[in-house]
């Protein structure tokens, strides 16, 4: 919550995703104190959501693009891997959009969401992405500084959270 409140203080940030404005997943609880004017609720259309965030970033905003589960992010790999990650190269450095992405490895406690909702693709994405940093948030003590670093960076960052931590830590 502290990280999201800090990001919300920035004039150029907007939170976009599923259940960022209305309850429906654990990420919502980290955003419910954020002014509704800073949040854009979208339906389940991950590919379009990532494209929207890339466009917002190209226009000078810093979107915080929230995907409730890592497994759902697979739906936006074209926009992430072939567009956001390659934008700087494709434009010979003219465009360098900054998107802060949040996702979560689905929780297994108190209810196991099943294999299609609890996978960790961190290492796979680290090997595919060259202009987007991928950060696994392994300890709650590092979360705030990692979000600060993502905001202060001159590139996009994917921050991967553990869903179990929403209930445990």
List each model region and its residues:
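Thiamine diphosphate
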Residues: 1-167
